[in-house]
Curated annotation (Swiss-Prot):
Function: Produces ATP from ADP in the presence of a proton gradient across the membrane. The gamma chain is believed to be important in regulating ATPase activity and the flow of protons through the CF(0) complex.
UniProt GO molecular function: ATP binding; proton-transporting ATP synthase activity, rotational mechanism
PANTHER family per record: ATP SYNTHASE GAMMA CHAIN, ATP SYNTHASE SUBUNIT GAMMA, MITOCHONDRIAL
Protein name: ATP synthase gamma chain
CDD domains: F1-ATPase_gamma (cd12151)
Organism: Staphylococcus saprophyticus subsp. saprophyticus (strain ATCC 15305 / DSM 20229 / NCIMB 8711 / NCTC 7292 / S-41)
Length: 288
C-alpha cells in the first residue's frame, strides 16, 4: 500500500482521465448520430442509381461494358478503410487482420495485389509490416462529403478500368448496431449480375439516347463511386460507435480504479490515525 500522498495523487490523475474519456464518449455519441443520419439519407440516392442500372443494364444481357464483365483474376486491388485517430478499440485491428489474412492466403507475391488505404492508422500499420501502398487518403473528415473521397474512389476504379487489376474489393468495418460491428469485405468491381438487377424497375419504360452502352459508360463509374462512398459512410458510423464504446469502457474502468484507490486511501488514513493514537497513548503511559 502506498503512502497517503501517492494514493491521493493517483486518485486525482485517474479522475482527470475519467473526465477526458467521458467527454470523448459524448463527442463520439454525437458523431455517431450524424454518421447514421448521413448513411440513411444517402440510401434513396443509391436506390435511384440502382433503378437506373436495372433499366439500362438489366434488360441488356449482352452488354460488353468492362465493369460488367467477369474476367480471370490475376491481380487484385484492395481498398482498406481505417481511421486517422486511435482510441477506437479493435476497430482498425479487426479490419487489418482480416486483410492480411486474405493476402497471405491468396497471394504468393506482392505483384499480385495493390493496396489503397483510407486513414493514417492503416497507412502506418501496413508500412510497418512491409506492405507496399499504391495510394492513400488521410485526414478524412468525421462526416465526409462525396467530393472529399471521390478522388480516392476514382483511383481505385482507375486501376480496374485501365486493366492494372481484375477486381476491386473493399475491407471495412460494417456498422450493425452501437454494440456490434463486423469486419467485412465487399467486391465493387466487376459488378455482379445481381448488381444490375437490384432496382425496382421504375425506369423500365424509358427510352435511352444515344444508346445504352453510352449511358452505361457514364453511370456505371458514378454508381461504383457511390458504392464506395456509401461503404465509407458505413465504416465511419462503425468507427464512431466503436470509439464511443471504448471510451465508455474506459470511463467505467476509471470509476472502478477510483473506488479501489479510495478504499486504499481510507485504510491508509485509518492506519495512520491509529498509529498516531497509539503513539500518544504510549507517550502518556511513559509520563505516568
Amino acid at each position: 500500500m502506498g503512502s497517503l500522498k501517492e494514493i491521493d495523487t493517483r486518485i486525482k490523475s485517474t479522475k482527470k482521465m475519467k473526465q477526458i474519456t467521458k467527454a470523448m464518449n459524448m463527442v463520439s455519441s454525437s458523431k455517431l448520430r450524424r454518421a447514421e443520419s448521413n448513411a440513411k439519407q444517402f440510401r434513396p440516392y443509391m436506390e435511384k442509381m440502382q433503378d437506373a442500372i436495372t433499366a439500362v443494364a438489366g434488360s441488356d444481357k449482352n452488354s460488353r461494358h468492362p465493369m460488367l464483365q467477369q474476367r480471370e483474376v490475376k491481380k487484385s486491388a484492395y481498398l482498406v478503410i481505417t481511421s486517422d485517430k486511435g482510441l477506437a478499440g479493435a476497430y482498425n485491428a479487426n479490419v487489418l487482420k482480416h486483410l492480411i489474412k486474405d493476402i497471405e492466403e491468396k497471394h504468393a507475391s506482392k505483384d499480385d495485389y495493390s493496396i489503397v488505404v483510407l486513414g493514417q492508422t492503416g497507412v502506418d500499420f501496413l508500412k510497418n509490416k512491409g506492405y507496399d501502398i499504391h495510394d492513400s487518403l488521410i485526414d478524412v473528415p468525421d462526416q465526409p462529403s462525396f467530393k472529399e473521397v471521390q478522388a480516392i474512389a476514382k483511383k481505385a476504379i482507375g486501376l480496374y478500368s485501365e486493366g492494372e487489376v481484375d477486381e476491386v474489393k473493399i475491407y471495412f468495418s460494417h456498422f450493425v448496431s452501437v454494440l456490434e460491428n463486423t469486419p467485412s469485405t465487399k467486391t465493387v468491381l466487376p459488378l455482379s449480375p445481381e448488381d444490375s438487377s437490384l432496382g425496382h424497375g421504375q425506369m423500365s419504360s424509358y427510352e435511352f439516347e444515344p444508346d445504352k452502352e453510352a449511358i452505361l459508360s457514364v453511370i456505371l463509374p458514378q454508381y461504383v463511386e457511390s458504392l464506395i462512398y456509401g461503404t465509407i459512410l458505413d465504416a465511419k458510423a462503425s468507427e464512431h460507435a466503436t470509439r464511443m464504446t471504448a471510451m465508455k469502457n474506459a470511463s467505467d474502468n476509471a470509476s472502478e480504479i477510483i473506488d479501489d484507490l479510495s478504499i486504499q486511501y481510507n485504510r491508509a488514513r485509518q492506519a495512520a490515525i491509529t498509529q498516531q493514537i497509539t503513539e500518544i497513548v504510549g507517550g502518556s503511559v511513559a509520563l505516568e
